[in-house]
A protein has these predicted regions:
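Adenosine-phosphate binding glycine-rich loop
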Residues: 1-16, 107-157
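Rossmann-like adenosine-cofactor binding region
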Residues: 55-131
Length: 157
């Protein structure tokens, strides 16, 4: 999935590399914990304080999403999981030259792909990676998630 894309596209190993992860929902949590396990220095930019605190409890750095433009110059690798445009032209212009952006968010994604290209970044909209890499497992996870969501919904009534 995402880790495979990063390993294939980066010129350097993830070990010791600074990676900016946007969003810390279920996908962000899965990617973040794996990146950290591979030795990446992960900074999670999230809107909700609880998500930032959770990231910090797992050994990652937490940052306010509102500070994204100020954070950008420290990174050349970004993974986005937020399905709203957060990687705008002004933010992209502040990333290190030739940055790699892997956008996992559903269409239209969270990246201004045209602006990324103009800035000289490589931006990949990596949709449906679990289904492409491991379709049976992906189906099981989707089914389990839907069941959990239905249970939570019933419990809220």
């Amino acid at each position: 999935g995402c880790i495979g894309v990063l390993l294939a596209q980066r010129k350097r190993t993830l070990w010791g590399s600074a990676v900016l992860l946007l969003g810390f929902g279920p996908v962000g949590q899965a990617v973040g914990t794996r990146l950290a396990a591979l030795g990446a220095h992960v900074t999670v930019a999230a809107r909700r304080p609880a998500q930032r605190a959770q990231a910090e409890s797992l050994g990652m750095q937490g940052a306010e999403l509102a500070r994204l433009a100020r954070l950008a110059p420290a990174f050349d690798t970004v993974v986005n999981t937020i399905p709203a445009q957060v990687l705008t032209a002004p933010v992209l212009a502040r990333l290190r030259p030739g940055s790699l952006i892997v956008d996992l968010a559903s269409r239209p994604g969270g990246t201004d792909f045209d602006a990324a290209a103009r800035c000289g970044h490589k931006a990949i909209h990596a949709l449906s990676l679990p289904a492409a890499c491991a379709p049976e497992t992906a189906g099981e996870i989707v089914a389990r998630t839907v069941r959990e969501m239905l249970r939570e919904r019933e419990g809220a009534r």
